[in-house]
């Protein structure tokens, strides 16, 4: 068993694709349209779906905003340097909501950003994080 994807409902599919690809450095892996049920999908990630978990962006036609509620927490991404990643995100128009610094009660360096729909994304500093944002 392995994790395949996390689905996020978005109010503007192209805006979300732009954020995840241009701001966070992911690749657009595939898209699909379902006119019968009036929704569109886009899958984004740092590697192929056959090897890594990805994010499914779901746009339900005509719905431009969702209530996020209080149950959802965040998605976490590893970065080589959280402060540099925040600066890069800011330069690309992203919203940094918590600057890089140690997690409360610990030493791991983290930061938080929000996507255009308000979903929180944690950046966790891990040296040699691999490919993707901050690398």
UniProtKB/Swiss-Prot annotation:
UniProt entry tagged with the keyword Ligase: no
One of the record's GO cellular component terms: cytosol
One MF term in the entry's GO annotations: protein homodimerization activity
Reported consequences of knocking out the gene: Deletion of the gene increases the HOCl sensitivity. Mutant is more sensitive to methylglyoxal treatment.
Binding site for substrate: 9, 60, 74
Gene3D superfamilies linked: 2,3-Dihydroxybiphenyl 1,2-Dioxygenase, domain 1
Keywords per UniProt: Detoxification, Lyase, Metal-binding, Nickel
Catalyses which reaction(s): (R)-S-lactoylglutathione = methylglyoxal + glutathione
Superkingdom: Bacteria
Pathway membership, UniProt: Secondary metabolite metabolism; methylglyoxal degradation; (R)-lactate from methylglyoxal: step 1/2
Positions bound to Ni(2+): 5, 56, 74, 122
UniProt cofactor note: Binds 1 nickel ion per subunit. In the homodimer, two nickel ions are bound between subunits. Is not active with zinc ions.
Presence of keyword Lyase: yes
Stored InterPro entries: Glyas_Bleomycin-R_OHBP_Dase (IPR029068), Glyas_Fos-R_dOase_dom (IPR004360), Glyoxalase_1 (IPR004361), Glyoxalase_1_CS (IPR018146), VOC (IPR037523)
Disulphide bond pairs: none
Signal peptide: none
PROSITE patterns per the UniProt record, alphabetical: GLYOXALASE_I_1, GLYOXALASE_I_2, VOC
Coiled-coil portions: none
Free-text function comment from the UniProt entry: Catalyzes the isomerization of the hemithioacetal formed spontaneously from methylglyoxal and glutathione, to S-lactoylglutathione, which is then hydrolyzed by a type II glyoxalase (GloB or GloC). Is involved in methylglyoxal (MG) detoxification. Involved in resistance to hypochlorous acid (HOCl), which is the active component of household bleach and a powerful antimicrobial during the innate immune response.
Entry's family note: Belongs to the glyoxalase I family.
Subunit structure: Homodimer.
Protein name: Lactoylglutathione lyase
Source organism of this protein record: Escherichia coli (strain K12)
Protein's gene: gloA
């Amino acid at each position: 068993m392995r994790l395949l994807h996390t689905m996020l409902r978005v109010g503007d599919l192209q805006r979300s694709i732009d954020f995840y690809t241009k701001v966070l450095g992911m690749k657009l892996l595939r898209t699909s349209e379902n006119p019968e049920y009036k929704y569109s999908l886009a899958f984004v990630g740092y590697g192929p779906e056959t090897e890594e978990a990805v994010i499914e962006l779901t746009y339900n036609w005509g719905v431009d905003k969702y209530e996020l509620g209080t149950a959802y927490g965040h998605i976490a991404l590893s970065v080589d340097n959280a402060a540099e990643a925040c600066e890069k995100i800011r330069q690309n128009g992203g919203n940094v909501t918590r600057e890089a610094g140690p997690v409360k009660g610990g030493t791991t360096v983290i930061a938080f950003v929000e996507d255009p729909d308000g979903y929180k994304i944690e950046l966790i500093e891990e040296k040699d994080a691999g490919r993707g944002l901050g690398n």
